[in-house]
Amino acid sequence: MKYFVVALTLAVAFVCIEECKTVEIGYAVSEDFDQNEIDNDEARQAFKTFTPDWNKIRNDAKRMQDNLEQMKKKFNLNLEEARQAFQTFKPDWNKIRYDAMKMQTSLGQMKKRFNL
């Protein structure tokens, strides 16, 4: 029961602190609006008259796409070919085992020869 009371007290304290912060922030924001004399109608008008520069946006997108194409050509990237190559890759495990055994034999001979 003690833990429940402590937890409840902490929860209430946390809510009170958060509410105080909200009130302080709201008061500070309203003070700023009063100081700068920002009118809601002015803000609406400014928002309505905002027009993004669509030509610049299109040109930037086209430039980025061209850069991507140049990188693909430069590094010879073809994702579909890479996927196919990865899916069809089948290592020759017999050759790998044979090479590993040869290397192990050579290593054993070197140990004997150099007394390692």
Swiss-Prot record:
Disulfide bonds: none annotated. Keywords: Pyrrolidone carboxylic acid, Secreted, Signal, Toxin. GO terms for cellular component: extracellular region. A motif (Processing quadruplet motif 2) lies at residues 80-83. Residues 1-22 form the signal peptide. A motif (Processing quadruplet motif 1) lies at residues 41-44. It is found in: Secreted. Residues 23-44, 80-83 form a propeptide. It holds the Pfam family Latarcin. Expressed by the venom gland. GO terms for molecular function: toxin activity. Belongs to the cationic peptide 03 (latarcin) family. 06 subfamily. The mature peptides (45-79 and 84-116) probably form alpha-helices which disrupt target cell membranes. This is M-zodatoxin-Lt6a/c. It comes from Lachesana tarabaevi.
